[in-house]
Regions:
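C-terminal helical subdomain
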Residues: 108, 175-176, 203, 220-254, ...
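Short, flexible catalytic-loop segment of classical short-chain dehydrogenase/reductase
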Residues: 132, 205-216
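Catalytic loop of short-chain dehydrogenase/reductase
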Residues: 88-91, 122-196, 208
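Conserved glycine-rich Rossmann-like NAD(P)H-binding loop of the short-chain dehydrogenase/reductase
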Residues: 25-40
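Rossmann-fold cofactor-recognition segment
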Residues: 45-63
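Conserved glycine-rich cofactor-binding loop
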Residues: 9-13
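Conserved NAD(P)H cofactor-binding loop of Rossmann-fold oxidoreductase domains
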Residues: 84-89, 264
Length: 276
């Protein structure tokens, strides 16, 4: 039976670059909301020698995620899931929409794919270094736990927290940071839950990356660039390689942690470049 790698948000950016770093003997399934973008990415992967398929999926819809998991499992044994689907504050949408896609979408992906995965497989949830700059008083893990038991209360409480910011963009920024802080927490929780099934779970937090989404955030997120070790944005291919490496089965002892891949900007801001 062939091994299958699923990448949500795989039609472009770091998700597509991660697909290009996977072994060519794997079947690659990329998903997203725009079929034309996915089809273009599939053609690009096929030209490189991959057996690749496109499947539309809205990760904020559990049934859509379930259909993706079922489809992937019909192609072979699902060994790698890289959940890179997400939205940022600069994109169209509301605070609740950001939380539904980034936070609840992660819950749906982890829960539905864990049902079709076997020992020796891995889920990599993509977070963001914005998870590390969130004021501590906004972080409430009891609220995070509601994501699995009471979704609407979970959303209402996090939207309320994000409303503490002034201005629409800032409120969306708080919602984004909350959603990504949740992803880090939830991936760790799943690591210990799914570890009993032999499924490894890790999160990876990029910094500002030169993708379409990253460029939208450059005006505000760019403030962190001077704090990075090389004082630059990350490149999609660098993050793609990092994701593929973390998702590699040979990295079997890497679980229950967040891999901070932001050029050192979080460390620089907190410890070494405070005067910049």
């Amino acid at each position: 039976m062939s091994n299958v790698c699923v990448i949500t948000g795989g039609g472009s950016g770091m998700g597509l670059e991660a697909a290009k770093c996977m072994p060519k003997e794997k079947i690659i399934v990329i998903s997203g909301r725009t079929l034309s973008k996915l089809e273009g990415a599939v053609e690009e992967l096929k030209a490189l020698g991959y057996q690749a398929y496109a499947k539309t999926c809205d990760t904020s819809d559990r049934e859509s995620v379930r259909e993706l998991a079922t489809y992937a499992a019909s192609l072979g044994e699902v060994k790698n899931v890289i959940n890179s689907a997400g939205v940022s504050p600069a994109m169209k949408g509301t605070q609740e929409g950001i939380l539904r896609i980034n936070a609840l979408g992660t819950v749906y992906v982890n829960q539905e794919f864990s049902k079709v995965m076997k020992p020796g497989s891995v889920i990599v949830d993509v977070s963001s270094n914005s998870a590390y700059v969130l004021p501590s008083f906004l972080i409430n893990k009891k609220v995070y736990a509601l994501a699995e038991t009471d979704e609407e209360t979970f959303l209402k409480k996090l939207v309320k927290k994000s409303n503490l910011a002034k201005g629409e963009y800032q409120r969306k920024g708080f919602a984004y940071s909350l959603s990504k802080n949740f992803v880090v927490w939830y991936a760790k929780k799943c690591a210990f839950e799914y570890g009993k099934q032999g499924i490894r779970v890790v999160s990876l937090s990029p910094g500002l990356i030169a993708t379409d989404m990253g460029n939208l955030e450059k005006e505000d997120g760019g403030m962190l660039i001077p704090f990075s070790a090389e004082e630059r944005m990350g490149r999609p291919e660098e993050l793609g390689y990092a994701l593929a490496t973390v998702a590699d089965e040979r990295n079997g002892y890497l679980a229950g942690v967040d891999v901070l891949c932001d050029g050192g900007s979080t460390t620089g801001m907190k410890e070494f470049k405070k005067k910049k």
